[in-house]
Each structure stands twice: as structure tokens, then as C-alpha cells.
Amino acid sequence: MMNILLGVGNEANGDDGIGVWVARNFSHEGWRSIDCFTVPENYTSEIKRSDAKKVVIVDAADMGLDAGEMRIIPKDRIGLAGFSTHSLPLSIFIKHIQETKGVDVILIGIQPEQFYSGISEKVMEAGKSLLEILRRGSFEEIEVL
């Protein structure tokens, strides 16, 4: 049994690259980490073929919070958070994965500060903190939006 981490975003857009950064820097037993760029739907077949019990999606999300704050975003609140770089809305992707695979999907948003010149210090600190939370499996440390 394993879990899958999907890092979503675009590094060319500053803080929008935090999901990709987390995916590239996360390694832990029982996890498969995938850098999805801005197209997590391209990995639907891989997720379906896996024995994953949990899928965690990490992305920059405009939630109206201070830069670097992170939240678990329930599926009924996805519309309240802004995700600007995806071709398919994350809500549709998540619903499809849950219905076809029957896995638990957790969406973690990190509030961006800026969308230019690399990942900002506050957002990078949040990404590093999230790596540790993922390794511990202690999702309860993250507030729900």
C-alpha cells in the first residue's frame, strides 16, 4: 500500500511553483511523489493503476491569507480558493479520482506572496514545513480552510 503526492504548479510563476518544489523534494517510504506541473489530470491513469490509499495534492492557492499560510481545502470549499494555472479545475480532477479509485484525496493549499522571480521566503518556509508534516503523516497539524 502506498500514498501519492502530486505537486502542482509552475515554477516560472514564482510562488505558484511551491507544489512542484514540494514534490521534487519529498521522499519517504510508502510514498510516490509526482511533479505534475500544471496538468495533474495527465497522471489519472497512473493513479488508477496504483495501489494508493491516499492522494495528497499540494498547490499554491489564493485563500486570502498571509503569505506562506497553508490549509487543507475541503472539496466543498475549493471554489473559494484561487488556482490560476490549471487547464482542468482541481475540483473536477479530485471528484474523478475519488469516484473512480475510491481513495482519500487531501488538497493542501499554500498562500502565495508573489508570482515572479522564484519562490518567496515565506512560501519556501511553508514548503519545508510541509515536507516534515508529510513525513510524519500528521495532517492534523494543518488547519482546514
Language model segments and positions:
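N-terminal catalytic or cofactor-binding beta/alpha core of small enzyme domains
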Residues: 1-112, 117-145
